[in-house]
A protein has these predicted regions:
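Subtilisin-like serine protease catalytic core
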Residues: 10, 129-260, 277-281, 308-310, ...
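Autoinhibitory N-terminal propeptides
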Residues: 7-134, 142, 159, 243-244, ...
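N-terminal domain-start motif of subtilase-like serine proteases
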Residues: 20, 26-47, 90, 109-163, ...
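Active-site core segment of subtilase-fold serine proteases
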Residues: 150-211, 228-230, 276, 365-449, ...
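C-terminal subdomain of the subtilisin-like protease fold in secreted/lumenal serine endopeptidases
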Residues: 42-45, 248, 279-288, 292-295, ...
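Hydrolase catalytic cores
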Residues: 214, 236-243, 270-280, 310, ...
Length: 729
């Protein structure tokens, strides 16, 4: 065993740094030491000497001087927090500046499409929920989506007539059109001609995620039943960097793509909305695991600064709901543990306790081989960094453990435990870890690898599927969205039935991540349908990957302007998140000054509850499933008016004709007479009219009413006819 010691002529202040920044700084210091030894200090030590990191930097005073002296470029400011491009070689010196309080960056995200569905080779379709009211369509609201894999030419992003193009602005952070670009990375495109000429995001041949999520949030539906929520909204997009895009980025620029770069993307969308004096909601279907380092503290503060009246950010909870991610060893219990499996470099857990305890690693070949580490020994190491290379039987392991104070409670110590080997861990040779110490209360969080069971020791079976909400959905500044399920299968474009059963009736999809957050807050905030969703798919991805597995989940192919496009079925919190964003676009049309807190209040008052035995909000469903229509009634202030139903009639369609008469279309001729009441949005009854039975179409003359929004209430003994809707005339 040995404790790491980082010797350097100038030792960085690691306490100011997030994990990624600290790791990059250590690398720079090691490079510097190597240069001194080899006598090459005056020469470029390696190519990464010119690399830059996009980071959040909190500076209490004299920021301009600090950045100038350390060759940093300020990209955006939010009070005392800046997004800055920092040369890697300046990280140590920057951390030693007395006015610099924190330097924070984190690697980019993964997508939140349900990976289990791909593994099962089954991606069903869900065509949508109840019809939306005619009065609210998202008109005048900016729907922003930051994602990857955009087909900018898909007819779903025109209006319903495929005439008017709705994408107003697009920043591709991976674009190589950088010669005249004013953007930190990539390039921005504006207007119909420029965006359609660009055609697809740079990763559009290998990704199509954003084409799908954008369609859910704001697609017009183009000759289909698959219309999005805010289908008349204005669209502003950012194509960012995610895991899977590595081949598209020069290694010299790899650290320019971080959470801070994503924050610039959010700002880009919000700035567009502000410039045009429009309310804005942003959908973000990506994320990464939480931590106890506080690696997203400044990120949260920046997103909070970007939010406010008419400015709302929505993010997906993640798809780890079926993954064992947490266990708790209470005081009085001697030990608790689990078997683990994973890639050679991806077995990683985080432990949290206010008391000392013992960690036991066991490798099982012909017999048990045990290695034990006491937390007291970890804390005695320089910077509380412990590293040991140990042979257990015929297999060699490297154990790296870092101890530090929790960013949420300084009385609690946290230990990041990583296990490495030259080959996969836990497969050919079973491997377990165990927490020992009857006097310690210890919480264990999975960060990498899979927790399993093995008959070699049936005691070691700890783990529950909780505490797996991803960041930024876990942040207090963001509305986090989980996913519910309705349908269990589709027939694809080849006529094949493809089952994928995650339940029916609005039950939580088992994949949908579960709270609480690492600091104990309830998440997710809200649910929406996320299983079996049909939306647009990229023609460029289809053209490049005609045999890809996900193409088997296309439900239809069609031609538009000489290209073949698709409607595709998909599942995950990636799909539920844009549904909530699009719904909030309708709410913002009704009340453009809505805040996140206002929206949470709407959830609390109007969400539906699948499991009525639970108390809401909770860590499985949040406040429940969003009810778009009931939320609109609540926002307009008519939800409590006696005589107005809180649901729309499921057997009726409404159409406002050019002569300002409302056509009421029933699915079948009415067997009973019914009445129609017209209310103002202040709740005043304006008119009541009765209609005789025997017809399937009726006309209500509203030509004498001033232009505006009205509540139309149908009263009938037929439950499919009874209900209310909102009509704009």
């Amino acid at each position: 065993m040995f404790c790491t010691v980082c010797a350097s002529a100038q030792h960085a202040n690691y306490a100011k740094m997030s994990t990624m920044v600290r790791q990059l700084t250590l690398q720079q210091e090691l490079i510097g030491r190597q240069g001194n030894i080899e006598g090459t200090r005056s020469k470029p030590i390696c190519s990464n000497q010119s690399q830059e990191l996009c980071a959040f930097v909190k500076v209490s005073k004299d920021a301009q001087r600090v950045f100038q002296e350390h060759h940093c470029k300020s990209l955006a400011q939010f009070g005392d927090i800046f997004i800055v491009s920092v040369p890697l070689r300046q990280l140590t010196k920057l951390s030693l500046e007395k006015y610099v309080d924190r330097i924070e960056a984190r690697r980019s995200n993964g997508l939140h499409t349900d990976s289990l569905a791909y593994c099962l080779d089954a991606m069903p379709v869900y065509a949508g929920t109840s019809p939306l009211p005619q009065a609210y369509t998202g008109r005048g609201v900016v729907v922003g989506v930051q994602d990857v894999g955009f087909d900018l030419t898909h007819p779903n992003f025109f209006d319903a007539t495929a005439t008017n193009y709705r994408i107003q602005r697009f920043w591709d952070q991976l674009s190589v059109d950088t010669l005249k670009s004013k953007m930190y990375v990539g390039a921005s495109y504006e207007g119909r001609a420029e965006i359609l000429t660009y055609a697809h995001s740079r990763d559009g041949l290998i990704q199509t995620h954003g084409t799908h999520t954008l369609g859910i949030a704001a697609g017009s539906g183009y000759n289909s039943a698959y219309r999005g929520m805010g289908y008349e909204s204005d669209i502003c997009l950012v194509s960012n960097f995610v895991v899977g895009d590595e081949a598209l980025v020069d290694s010299a620029n790899r650290y320019k793509y971080t959470y801070a770069t994503d924050a610039l993307g959010f700002k880009y969308i919000m700035d567009y909305a502000k410039y045009n004096n429009q309310p804005c909601v942003i959908s973000f279907s990506e994320g990464s695991r939480q931590d106890f380092h506080g690696d997203d503290v400044l990120y949260n503060a920046v997103l909070d600064s970007l939010s406010g009246p008419g400015r709302i950010i929505i993010a997906s909870a993640g798809n780890d709901g079926q993954v064992k991610s947490y266990f708790h060893k209470p005081i009085g219990q001697v030990g608790m543990g689990t078997f683990v499996e994973g890639r050679p470099d991806n077995v990683y857990v985080t432990l949290k306790s206010a008391s000392p305890f013992q960690i036991r690693f066991t490798s099982y070949d012909d017999t048990k081989h045990i290695h034990e580490v006491f937390t007291q020994d970890i804390l005695r190491c320089k910077d509380s960094i412990y590293v040991d290379t140990v042979r257990l039987g015929n297999k060699q392991y490297v154990f790296s453990i870092v101890g530090y104070r929790s960013c949420y409670d300084s009385a609690e110590l946290v230990y990041d435990v990583r296990m490495w080997s030259k080959s996969e861990i836990g497969h050919a040779v079973p491997f377990s870890f165990e927490i020992l110490g009857a006097q310690a209360d210890v919480e264990v969080f999975r960060m990498g690898g899979v927790w399993t069971v093995n008959q070699l020791d049936e005691r070691l079976s700890a783990g529950e599927c909780t505490h797996n909400i991803h960041s930024p959905a876990s942040l207090s500044s963001v509305i986090g969205v989980g996913a519910t399920s309705y349908r269990t299968g589709i027939t694809n474009y080849l006529g094949e039935w493809r089952p994928y059963n995650q339940g029916v009736g609005g039950v939580r999809g088992a994949y949908s991540s579960v709270g609480p957050t690492y600091d104990g807050r309830v998440k997710p905030d809200v649910m929406a349908p996320g299983t079996n969703i049909i939306s647009s798919y990229s023609s460029y991805y289809l053209e490049k990957n005609p045999k890809a597995n996900d193409i088997k989940s296309d439900v239809a192919h069609f031609e538009f302007n000489g290209r073949t496009y698709a409607w595709n079925s998909n599942a995950g919190t990636s799909m539920s998140t844009p549904a909530v964003a699009g719904a909030i676009a309708l709410w913002l049309q009704a009340k453009p000054t809505l805040t996140r807190e206002d929206v949470m209040d709407v959830f609390a008052k109007t969400c539906t509850h699948y499991d009525t035995s639970l108390t809401y909000p909770n860590n499985w469903y949040g406040y429940g499933q969003i009810d778009v229509y009931k939320g609109l009634l609540y926002i307009l202030g008519v939800s409590g008016v006696k005589g107005i139903s809180s649901h729309q009639p499921t057997g009726v369609q409404f159409e406002v004709r050019a002569d300002r008469k409302i056509e009421i279309k029933l699915k079948e001729p009415s067997c009973h007479h019914f009445s129609v009441c017209v209310y103002s949005t202040s709740g005043v009854l304006l008119e009541r009219k009765s209609f005789d039975a025997g017809f399937s179409s009726y006309l209500l003359d509203v030509s004498s009413y001033p232009r505006g929004v009205y509540v139309i209430q149908l009263n009938s003994s037929n439950p499919f006819v009874k209900g209310s809707t909102l009509i704009r005339i």
